[in-house]
């Protein structure tokens, strides 16, 4: 029993020490390969924000069309121009869309990861990490990822620097700090999960969901919402992706916000999202 307890404590320490400030200060120079210096935010871009937004819209529209038979409440609230746009997308003479429409007629839909593969040419999923004691990781399950592609989003509740996050942060390895000090809590368990669900329900407008909460479950509607499980590089394995910060614009289509895996802790804030990008 003591040996098992000590082994468990040692494993927890190996995971936690990278967030323990004194240990980081003493060991910073021992791992030069894992350091990444960013001179300023404007230079920390793999691709432009326009390209990021274009990718998100492309994927989210494909997911929306795939769920078209479940969107009746939303469609009735949209302007005619927007409704006609989606009806036109369904009727486009393209083999992929034809097959999609046929599946709708059969009261069936593609899985989200299949939509991602058909839209971007690859799919990703969570699985046990190949790194020792790293828990879960993210793997490309189909296709290949080109350089500069958006491969995932970092989900979670978005906290401004002045907002309370102490209790959520205890023993939480999924808190991501942005360059400007904004924090994203990507933990899908415990109090973090409760806070996210509460904020998501608070911001809902009738049939319109302002965020996606399915990343908290095993049945994810947005297949990109796995970024919190992307592991850092190690001395043995270099990073093949990097994080790029992106603010979702206020004019983002309201019918597609149901796929955004982020929600602001305060209802008056509309800051969303970190994206994981293909780096090399």
Describe the predicted segments one by one.
Residues 1-280:
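Conserved catalytic SET/PR domain of SAM-dependent protein methyltransferases, capturing the structural core
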